[in-house]
A protein has these predicted regions:
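N-terminal functional module of multi-domain proteins
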Residues: 2-122
């Protein structure tokens, strides 16, 4: 059985990303220009997700708030590895530019912000 995959556009993007990467609040202006595919597969206690997105000229931004964190009380470790472009993460412990083929790790109990540059972004 293959992973669940869906093509997403601005209006459906939040739900697709929430199912793959927990709850986030997205910048409405930059979200309106984002489209792509999200695929998720659960293997036992592990959820593997793939994103292939095209952002608009201003990139794409979002953040996890206290409300988002409380919506899923069980803590998770999240591994992200960009394979096209990079992701910039900001947390209470610092700022991190996760480059292509570099693994970033964060836990779901952290306040976190992300920013993608304009263009294509792909991650597993």
């Amino acid at each position: 059985m293959g992973p669940e995959s869906q093509t997403v556009y601005a209006d459906d993007l939040g739900q697709a990303v929430h199912s793959a990467h927990l709850a986030w609040q997205f910048d409405p202006l930059s979200t309106s220009d984002v489209s792509g595919q999200v695929a998720t597969r659960t293997i036992g206690p592990v959820r593997v997700s793939w994103l292939d997105l095209m952002t608009g000229p201003s990139g794409w931004r979002g953040r996890r708030t206290f409300s988002d964190i409380r919506s899923v009380p069980e803590p998770y470790l999240i591994f992200c590895m960009p394979i096209c472009n990079s992701i910039y993460l900001t947390s209470e412990s610092g700022n991190f530019d996760i480059a292509e083929f570099t693994c970033g790790i964060w836990d779901s109990t952290q306040l976190l912000e992300f920013e993608l540059k304009a263009g294509r972004y792909e991650q597993i």
